[in-house]
Amino acid sequence: MFEHAFEVWSPHAPHVPRAHRVFERDGWRCTAPGCSSYRNLQDHHVVFRSAGGSDALSNRTTLCAWHHLRGVHAGIIRCAGDAPDHLVFELGLRAAGPPLARYCGDQRIA
């Protein structure tokens, strides 16, 4: 009986949507530098699945809809590395020249 209860109420129970595991790990907040939005959260694959990326938690991060759709998928923001602690965000991507800023977490690195 206790085993069943532990399985059902475990934070990693199979019935919990995968995205919720990512959101929970990231504190239910957008992980883009300077953003703390808790609305319209989306599960982002750091290495896109279409490019061979996995569903592993280390390849996924939480982004708000704005940073996900108008940033990453619009080609203005790039995210690379292993989640949650080793993600590098490049902001202000341009056709010529380096990105305007690079962050690891909320720490600016370039």
Describe the predicted segments one by one:
Residues M1-A110:
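A boundary/linker detector
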